[in-house]
Amino acid sequence: MSSETWELIQKMSVKDAELQLALQCAPLIAGLKVSNLLILDRSGMESVKRILSGSCISFFLLAMAEHKVTLLLYQEKKLSDYLAEERNREFLQRYGYGEMDLQNILRAFWVRYQAHLQKKEDFPHEMGILLGYPVEDVEGFILHKGKNYLCAGYWKVYVN
């Protein structure tokens, strides 16, 4: 990153929706990931809607708190194709997902995520699949309870 870019970023408000979108979702925007979580101030929601309208990136509201929102941003075709891969489809079916089209999966995940936020259910680890993580690593994370991984970056790697 150039010093000019760094200086520009430093002058921006951390509450700025455009900055948060760029910082948190750069791999998605660049087409390197199928999806990404975006957590930002509620006040930035309209800016995100405006920025994403007409783009190839869609969003799904996962949670809205008093001051924050959590969105799943995704490229619809890429995420649909990823979820349709046999290993991912089988994983989701084992976790109770029946209808395998993207919108039904997102709605079912929302229900499970809300139950977790309300402390009624454990964390829905299938989020890893929705974020495009390899199913082997999601299964490894569940099996090893987040420990004994080979390496960690954006996610914890359990299988080489």
Residues of each region from the PLM?
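Accessory, usually C-terminal, subdomains that scaffold auxiliary metal cofactors
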Residues: 151-160
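Internal catalytic-core helix/loop-beta-alpha segment
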Residues: 96-125
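Conserved catalytic core of nucleotide polymerization and phosphodiester-bond processing enzymes
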Residues: 33, 63, 106, 142
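Short, surface-exposed beta-edge/turn micro-motifs
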Residues: 33-35, 67-69, 124-126
